Structures are given as C-alpha cells and as structure tokens.
Amino acid sequence: MYIDSHMHLINTKCFDRPTYDRLGQLIPKDTDINQLVEWMKAAGIEHCVCMGQDMHKVWNSEFGEVAVEDAFAKYPDFFVPFCSVEPIDEAGRFNQKNYDYMVDKLNNKGYRGVLFTPPYGQFNSNDPVMFPFYEAIDK
C-alpha cells in the first residue's frame, strides 16, 4: 500500500492578500481536488495525509484548512485529514480558541492528527503551554 504521508491543499480564501502583496508574494491557485486524486491514484497512491498549516504569526494566513475539509468530505476513504493550529497566541499564552478548534476536529470531525510548525508559530515544542495540546491528541 502506498500512502502520501504529508501534503498540503490550497484554497486562496485562506491567504491574507494585503500581507502577500506587501511582501511581493503571489497567492497560489486553488488545488484541483479531483485532478489531484486522479493523479495520485494513477501513481498507485491509496491514501493521502493532507493538512492545512496555521501561519498566522508570520503570514497572517492559514494554508488550506478549508481545502482539507472539502477534500475529506468529497473523498473520505482517500484523504486522512490533519488540522494545524498555533498553540500559543500573540501574547505568548495558551491559545484556548485553537485548542478548542483542534479538539473539535479530532473528536467530532474525523481528523486523525495535528500539524504543529514551531518556526511559523514562533514557539518551542517543549514549551509547557504545549502540554495540554499533546494530552488532548494522546486521548
């Protein structure tokens, strides 16, 4: 069995245009989910772990969480959804809103894992503020 273990889907609604314009960056096009699944299946891939990426602290954007939801709804037997959250808020404190979002995705929406990106979220993986997130994931 072949599984693509890490890929991102793009939805242009998730990007903050003023931030990208200010930095001279182009916003990528939406991922064509049907075409992507066709290509992956043609390559022998049976499942795909897909995830967004929370990048609010650096880019004031998130990388396609909406697209993950759409893809999983359309192809629930193909996509394995992961959510992505920044666990620490702008003031360096526990991010309750993102914690609640993550728990809902894992417990009620069929999500199977979580992507944390310390460089984008500007936190350390061993920060004690992370522990409640790890504990919720471990349940």
Residue ranges of model-derived segments:
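Active-site gating/metal-coordination segments in enzymes
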Residues: 46, 58-139
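An N-terminally biased module of ancient metal coordination in phosphate/nucleic-acid-related enzymes
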Residues: 1-63
